Amino acid sequence: MLDVNVFDELRIGLATADDIRRWSKGEVKKPETINYRTLKPEKDGLFCERIFGPTRDWECACGKYKRVRYKGIICERCGVEVTKSKVRRERMGHIELAAPVTHIWYFKGVPSRLGYLLDLAPKDLDLIIYFGANIITSVDEEARHSDQSTLEAEMLLEKKDVEADAESEIAERAEKLEEDLAELEAAGAKADARRKVQNAAEKEMQHIRERAEREIDRLEEIWQTFIKLAPKQMIRDEKLYDELVDRYEDYFTGGMGAESIQTLIRGFDLDAEAEELRTIINEGKGQKKMRALKRLKVVAAFQRSGNDPAGMVLNAIPVIPPELRPMVQLDGGRFATSDLNDLYRRVINRNNRLKRMIELGAPEIIVNNEKRMLQESVDALFDNGRRGRPVTGPGNRPLKSLSDLLKGKQGRFRQNLLGKRVDYSGRSVIIVGPQLRLHECGLPKLMALELFKPFVMKRLVENEYAQNIKSAKRMVERQRPEVWDVLEEAISEHPVMLNRAPTLHRLGIQAFEPVLVEGKAIQLHPLACEAFNADFDGDQMAVHLPLSAEAQAEARILMLASNNILSPASGKPLAMPRLDMVTGLYYLTLKKSPEEFGGQGAYQPADENGPEKGVYSSYAEAIMAYDRGVLGLQAPVRIRLDHLRPPAELENELFPEGWNQGDTWLAETTLGRVMFNEILPWNYPYLEGIMVRKGGGADKIMLGDVVNDLAARYPMITVAQTMDKMKDAGFYWSTRSGVTIAMSDVLVLPNKDEILDRYEAAARQIETKYNRGKLTGRERYDRLVELWKDATDEVGQAVEDIYPDDNPIPMIVKSGAAGNMRQIWTLAGMKGMVVNSKGDYITRPIKTSFREGLTVLEYFNNSHGSRKGLADTALRTADSGYLTRRLVDVAQDVIVRVEDCGTRQGVRVPVAAEVLDATGAVSGYTRHDLIETSVSGRVLAGDATNAEGEVILAAGSDLTELNIDLLVEAGIQQVKVRSVLTCQTPTGVCAKCYGKSMASGKQVDIGEAVGIVAAQSIGEPGTQLTMRTFHQGGVGGDITGGLPRVQELFEARVPKNLAPIASADGVIHLEDEGNFYTLTLVPDDGSDNVVYDKLSKRQGLASIRVPMEHNPAAFIERTLAEGDHVTVGTRLLRGAAAPHDVLEVLGRRGVEQHLIDEVQAVYRAQGVAIHDKHIEIIIRQMLRRGTVIESGSTEFLPGSLVDLSEAKLANSEAIANGGQPAELRSEIMGITKASLATESWLSAASFQETTRVLTDAAINKRSDKLIGLKENVIIGKLIPAGTGISRYRNISIKPTEAARNAAYSIPTYGESIYGDDGFGEFTGASVPLDEAF
């Protein structure tokens, strides 16, 4: 057996008949499977034990040899080898065919490889192979030439004979006619009768003449055909062929069926053909050249690979092992069998019948028919349904052939190799576990016992609770009390992995430390929900157990939930407080006036009535006052603090040297805000403001910003602890805030009718004008839509104004916990305009709110939008999943392979934006809007210098937040950064060009699978976009841009509303041609004018930005007009430019920027942040190849697609050897096409078009170097990414116990004011990644 981990590449090729016979253990001669009485396999049949091995371990078929001691003996009675029955999964047989057959993949695939090789049209091939026409395989030119005069003389003689025969026949007939006429005359017949006889005779003589002529023509045709006879000539006329064979069989050979094809292939000279084709390519033009190119691809493939083309015609076919096409007995005594057995049986039956007929010497026509049937049965076995009607089984179901076993989602590749099931796993419903730490999950006791069974059994024996494993197993099954104690020990320090389907990004599977819980539901930490996109309405999750020490270490260090707080897509925190927690923190940090509840005991300055009130000497004193009920949680007070760091401005003012713990300062704040700051690390600057999740403003602090800042300043462990404290505080205070929703909280607008009456009157006016013909239908529609939108807005504003701040509904919205103001308008104001099935607004709005209830008509109008939202979601979720699959496939081999590729190239990105004062002059600089997604986390490619030329940051510096601020201060508007688009690493990318990992905030590790992370980062929000449409009230919220636009871009398709682009800088001239414009571009450089005709008026001309006349610093937008000056690459119509056009006009960098901007535009419109580097990785894969224009002295074929890095190597080799380099043109490929063009045939075959990819790979004898992830998963090796790359594989360390304890020690969280709340004690945290251990 092969050791699975020892080979480096996997090659696929064409098998010859000898190979097939060599693999085989014997010939299958009979179509029988098993004996119906004994149920034993039949001898020489499809399940024969002599060929495939014994059905029982160490036992021959007749029972003479039993037991392992006879291992390897071949029984002399039944001929079966005594061995394990497992060999029936690996031993192959074969069928010797009585006549050769072609392999359907090579003949029927598109393009037909056989057709290209032999230069035959697929239609003709079909006729030959299926016995519809004859083909000449060889002609003895010399013999024909030397005997030509003799043969010609013979032919002339034959013609003369035919003529002479005809003449004599005609003479006889004339004689007979004379006799007949004489008789008639003697009998006194009338002239009429005599004429009849004469006419009949003349007709007969005419027939004789015509027959002779036909025969002579036929002879002439036979002779002419014979003289011009050439190999590969088809003769469809069977009689003509028979005549040729009868007369001249010594001078040529020919025939029909696969046999003649085989003869042609055997006599085929690859080298000569390749030479000839190259000549045609160099000298020819047009169609001829194109065909030669296509043919050369196939011919050169055989030439290069050393494959024997005869392998495309089979003399023997392999029979796969019987265990892979099993026959199983069902309950009713009937048998179920794999379709392959049926297909093999047909082949064997027809083959045996053909053998018998050949032996009996049956007529050729019968033999040919049987050969055709054999060919069809082999076709059905290899690829059923590829040609003609598929072979069907019972119930008219097409049988599954060998090709069908590989294809599609249910095929071998995707179902069994890439989609394996996993042992040591379980699944259950999830419920919330608010008492858990961030790195913990609650595991049901029963599930844990089953998962950890082997560990528990081992410990039971070790701790001497059980004598042996068997009794330990019994103890576990009976759930003895001591089992639970041992289980506690077994699960400690042993992380488990939780996964929620659909796993859209890498945070869909994370590791947690299990905590045993009662019940049968898994408990999930509330902060982990966002990453899993989980909620507790019946979602289920799967649990997986890492077994080996390495797997456990990996789960704990790389996958622990507390180490995965940041999103790999944008670097923003995902484990954020949400929903109740946000409400709780919002309530905790509110500020109220003394009159309101919670505002009692507020600060009052000293006056004549006494000293100041609401001042506390310490936090403890304030807590005491709160406990007594004197002080409200949200009352503005002054508290002297010494254990919290003051805000930055205050610190600079009070403690110029810097604040130290113990230094006191007076905080003007509320007790709630001090409590919130208690949660944060002690040296984090004090936060004074209301905590909200979204919608900032004065006195409001975004929780996201806080978590972001924490993640940047502190180690992950501190962030995780702080997040947990936030969660506890959030739940604690949201419970105590009493925020609930009841019908009575939805306040109804008292003056709503008055507002609506006003708008009703205006609507009636519009209708009247329309009825009088003063408005067109379109104007009426536009005005009514505008009017009712204003009405909805006015009612909405009025609703917002009547809600007091302490009403729970605005509290939930303002804190950013859930919902938005629009939803409150719908609840309490009015729903407004809705859309009909055509997508137009219905001009009667929904005037009622949900609180009042809709009328029947309004309900009906509303139903369409709601349904469309749900239907769209279902459809687009599937679309998004498919997009993710294609993205993953195209980028799966992009792995960080080296530290630095050493390039000085890069791309320019914006850093600072100018701030203009009232006069339009630059008054300063601010951070550019796109810094988050395009600049942060990169490495400088060149020095960043200011206007004076001073170097602010040297090349190679990381663009951290601090460094970016330096650049903005210096007024540097653009910098050149390293990018994967310009990375010079031949396979994968280098760490410097990639920059920092968004998920860790540190430079990316070598071995990181950045390609897959990129694909997930783009695909995951794709699903989010598609899932989040219906929240915006049905149809109004749909985006056509959305997913279809992203797909269009990544597939590099011509967009739906195509806009041509200017191919040069120049001035435009417009001509109106009715429904179209003709636009002429006059280039500035004086080159030829470019004419764009048939530009649709409906699409409309593009808009351009032009400076205002009186203020050139300001710009206005207007549509293109006569005489406008445009720059290269400007769109000329509204719509989108085609990526191929952009590549042609603006070059590689232009199309890269175009794609990034367009993709980002779609995501930004949805408020989704994705870093540019992820999109860049996909674009790099799309632009990896080029078309060979001139091959120079390289091996490349003109017109073929080659990898640019490969071409670079080949060119440098050619130049070094004094040859000519190849000329290439950059190509942009859609992601599907790029995936299929990948070097790895395993990866391409498992993606799409499996049979086509394998056919191609086999002809080229492709070798898969196993550098991507997919290939290695398929063959069951560790993936070459992460800890699977060789530099991490070949180390062995054994830490001491002390080191292990230090590394895995779990610090406690210390005391907390929420500790005694019945939520349980808190211990546990993540592994501190920052310690070098």
Curated annotation (Swiss-Prot):
<dbReference type="InterPro" id="IPR012754">
    <property type="entry name" value="DNA-dir_RpoC_beta_prime_bact"/>
</dbReference>
<dbReference type="InterPro" id="IPR045867">
    <property type="entry name" value="DNA-dir_RpoC_beta_prime"/>
</dbReference>
<feature type="binding site">
    <location>
        <position position="78"/>
    </location>
    <ligand>
        <name>Zn(2+) 1</name>
    </ligand>
</feature>
<dbReference type="InterPro" id="IPR007083">
    <property type="entry name" value="RNA_pol_Rpb1_4"/>
</dbReference>
<dbReference type="GO" id="GO:0003899">
    <property type="term" value="F:DNA-directed RNA polymerase activity"/>
</dbReference>
<dbReference type="InterPro" id="IPR042102">
    <property type="entry name" value="RNA_pol_Rpb1_3_sf"/>
</dbReference>
<keyword id="KW-0804">Transcription</keyword>
<dbReference type="InterPro" id="IPR000722">
    <property type="entry name" value="RNA_pol_asu"/>
</dbReference>
<dbReference type="Pfam" id="PF05000">
    <property type="entry name" value="RNA_pol_Rpb1_4"/>
</dbReference>
<keyword id="KW-0460">Magnesium</keyword>
<feature type="binding site">
    <location>
        <position position="539"/>
    </location>
    <ligand>
        <name>Mg(2+)</name>
    </ligand>
</feature>
<feature type="binding site">
    <location>
        <position position="537"/>
    </location>
    <ligand>
        <name>Mg(2+)</name>
    </ligand>
</feature>
<feature type="binding site">
    <location>
        <position position="535"/>
    </location>
    <ligand>
        <name>Mg(2+)</name>
    </ligand>
</feature>
<dbReference type="GO" id="GO:0003677">
    <property type="term" value="F:DNA binding"/>
</dbReference>
<comment type="function">
    <text>DNA-dependent RNA polymerase catalyzes the transcription of DNA into RNA using the four ribonucleoside triphosphates as substrates.</text>
</comment>
<dbReference type="InterPro" id="IPR007066">
    <property type="entry name" value="RNA_pol_Rpb1_3"/>
</dbReference>
<dbReference type="InterPro" id="IPR044893">
    <property type="entry name" value="RNA_pol_Rpb1_clamp_domain"/>
</dbReference>
<feature type="binding site">
    <location>
        <position position="75"/>
    </location>
    <ligand>
        <name>Zn(2+) 1</name>
    </ligand>
</feature>
<dbReference type="GO" id="GO:0008270">
    <property type="term" value="F:zinc ion binding"/>
</dbReference>
<dbReference type="GO" id="GO:0000428">
    <property type="term" value="C:DNA-directed RNA polymerase complex"/>
</dbReference>
<keyword id="KW-0808">Transferase</keyword>
<keyword id="KW-0548">Nucleotidyltransferase</keyword>
<dbReference type="GO" id="GO:0000287">
    <property type="term" value="F:magnesium ion binding"/>
</dbReference>
<dbReference type="InterPro" id="IPR006592">
    <property type="entry name" value="RNA_pol_N"/>
</dbReference>
<dbReference type="InterPro" id="IPR038120">
    <property type="entry name" value="Rpb1_funnel_sf"/>
</dbReference>
<protein>
    <recommendedName>
        <fullName>DNA-directed RNA polymerase subunit beta'</fullName>
        <ecNumber>2.7.7.6</ecNumber>
    </recommendedName>
</protein>
<dbReference type="GO" id="GO:0006351">
    <property type="term" value="P:DNA-templated transcription"/>
</dbReference>
<dbReference type="Pfam" id="PF04998">
    <property type="entry name" value="RNA_pol_Rpb1_5"/>
</dbReference>
<dbReference type="Pfam" id="PF04997">
    <property type="entry name" value="RNA_pol_Rpb1_1"/>
</dbReference>
<feature type="binding site">
    <location>
        <position position="993"/>
    </location>
    <ligand>
        <name>Zn(2+) 2</name>
    </ligand>
</feature>
<keyword id="KW-0240">DNA-directed RNA polymerase</keyword>
<comment type="similarity">
    <text>Belongs to the RNA polymerase beta' chain family.</text>
</comment>
<feature type="binding site">
    <location>
        <position position="983"/>
    </location>
    <ligand>
        <name>Zn(2+) 2</name>
    </ligand>
</feature>
<keyword id="KW-0479">Metal-binding</keyword>
<comment type="subunit">
    <text>The RNAP catalytic core consists of 2 alpha, 1 beta, 1 beta' and 1 omega subunit. When a sigma factor is associated with the core the holoenzyme is formed, which can initiate transcription.</text>
</comment>
<dbReference type="Pfam" id="PF00623">
    <property type="entry name" value="RNA_pol_Rpb1_2"/>
</dbReference>
<feature type="binding site">
    <location>
        <position position="60"/>
    </location>
    <ligand>
        <name>Zn(2+) 1</name>
    </ligand>
</feature>
<keyword id="KW-0862">Zinc</keyword>
<feature type="binding site">
    <location>
        <position position="901"/>
    </location>
    <ligand>
        <name>Zn(2+) 2</name>
    </ligand>
</feature>
<dbReference type="Pfam" id="PF04983">
    <property type="entry name" value="RNA_pol_Rpb1_3"/>
</dbReference>
<feature type="binding site">
    <location>
        <position position="990"/>
    </location>
    <ligand>
        <name>Zn(2+) 2</name>
    </ligand>
</feature>
<feature type="binding site">
    <location>
        <position position="62"/>
    </location>
    <ligand>
        <name>Zn(2+) 1</name>
    </ligand>
</feature>
